[in-house]
Amino acid sequence: AGMKEYELEAYFDFNCKSKGVKDLAFNTIAAAGKNATVLHYVDNNAEMKDGDLILFDLGAQYKYYNADISRTFPISGKFTARQKEVYNAVLKVNEEIINTIKPGITTAELNAKANDLLGEACVSLGLLEDKKDFRKYYFHSIGHSLGLDTHDVIIDRNFTFEPGMVYTVEPGLYIPDESIGIRIEDDILVTEDGSINLTKDMIKTVEEIEDFMSRNRIN
């Protein structure tokens, strides 16, 4: 708490550069509190406050190929009960959609499933009475192609997955009235018989995050 969003942006950028990364995939997003409910927040100049979450959307480039990862952490190091409830709902969708990806599945099918799951989550969280109104709290697609460009070129956005493709999975819920914005994004490689999560080593469960933050405080 007390740090500016741009200080954490700089910390990530510095660590990438110090490990030999020449370029980032895009400008790092560090969005605290209500700022995390803005999809492509770019200011990164607000003060971080205890009790809020901070959403990171970041990625490095390696041999011209890009990563695109989102994680959401509690600034205090501990999720509140409500934050944990919303976070776990998003994480469940993240994991279910990742497990759905395989050759032959279409992006339309993937989005339909994600929309249904997030709508159900909104109802169970007390945000909505009708899951069909999910766009109030989730207003983007489940992912995009990833490669030489962060949003890699696909002529038709509704396509069928084939081995060798890389696609992001990034469900989110954005609740301005509660200053909660959560997105969990992984990069998924489509294989011959399923998929591989290329970003599986990036911690994302509540327990992993709280344990990591208890041992690695930035003062």
Report residues per predicted region.
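Active-site neighborhoods and metal-handling regions in enzymes and metal-associated proteins
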Residues: A1-N219
